[in-house]
């Protein structure tokens, strides 16, 4: 037997189109050389955002045994110690490629609001901060709405459809950090895990890569640049 995910969002196509419109606007904001064109009006900073909860801090119970030959295997004892978990809240600026992290022991409304405050401090006042994000309850909670109301006009949210997280480009980044850094990592504490994750972000931001969306872009061809 094979399983599938039933589409239970009656507005799936509409919401998907809204996300793709944003990606098309981003595409049109670059010239042929890949440079960002000047905005004619209010600048819109678009951030692809999501949370990655439950990142485990795991310690070895015995040292790894290093390979004895150039092509040998590293051996690791099958027992380990769980030291707790961290949640990664992260966004990618779709114009610059910069990755923006926040680590927390939870991923509640208060954590999401803290991330919004980081964005608010990062981008100049008067510019719009547009987030592509999923329908997590923290993104629509009373606490979050209260914060947004106190910063009217500063943030715009574009929600992915239910079961449509694959439309959010941050998911590709989460896959990358899992492959390159988190899979198999061993640490002595949660603090070390946090330090190493933040260091990963510092390293990749030295040469940021702009993510480009390709799927169905040929169907979104009549939009004007978001300038």
Whereabouts are the PLM-identified features?
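C-terminal domain-tail junction helix/linker
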Residues: 192-227
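Electropositive, glycine- and tryptophan-enriched low-complexity nucleic-acid-binding patches
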Residues: 57, 67-127
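RNase H-like polynucleotidyl transferase catalytic core
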Residues: 75-80, 149-169, 185-187
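Charge-mixed, compositionally biased segments that are often intrinsically disordered regulatory tracts
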Residues: 1-82, 224-227
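Active-site proximal helix-loop segment of RNase H-like, two-metal nucleases, encompassing DDE(D)
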Residues: 170-192, 205
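Mobile genetic element proteins and their domesticated derivatives, centered on retroelements
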Residues: 48-50, 91, 97, 116, ...
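Acidic, metal-coordinating catalytic cores used for nucleic-acid/nucleotide bond scission
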Residues: 107-108, 131-142, 162-167
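Short, solvent-exposed loop/turn segments at secondary-structure junctions
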Residues: 52-55, 61, 94-96, 136-138, ...
């Amino acid at each position: 037997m094979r399983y599938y995910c039933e589409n239970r969002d009656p507005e799936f196509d509409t919401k998907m189109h809204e996300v793709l419109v944003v990606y098309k606007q981003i595409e049109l904001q670059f010239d042929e050389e890949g440079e960002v064109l000047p905005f004619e009006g209010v600048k819109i900073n678009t951030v692809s955002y999501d949370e990655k909860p439950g990142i485990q801090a795991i310690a070895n119970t015995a040292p790894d045994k290093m390979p004895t030959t150039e092509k040998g295997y590293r051996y690791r004892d099958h027992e380990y110690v769980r030291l707790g978990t961290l949640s990664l809240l992260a966004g990618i600026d779709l114009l610059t490629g910069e990755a923006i992290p926040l680590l927390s022991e939870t991923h509640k409304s208060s954590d999401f609001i803290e991330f919004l405050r980081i964005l608010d401090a990062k981008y100049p006042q008067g510019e719009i901060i547009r987030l592509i994000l999923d329908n997590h309850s923290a993104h629509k909670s009373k606490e979050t709405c209260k914060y947004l109301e106190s910063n009217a006009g500063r943030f715009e949210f574009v929600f992915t459809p239910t079961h449509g997280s694959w439309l959010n480009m941050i998911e590709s980044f989460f896959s990358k950090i899992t492959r390159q850094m988190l899979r198999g990592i061993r640490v002595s504490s949660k603090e070390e895990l946090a330090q190493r994750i933040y260091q990963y972000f510092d390293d990749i931001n030295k040469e940021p890569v702009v993510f480009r969306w390709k799927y169905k872009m040929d169907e979104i061809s009549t939009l004007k640049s978001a300038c």
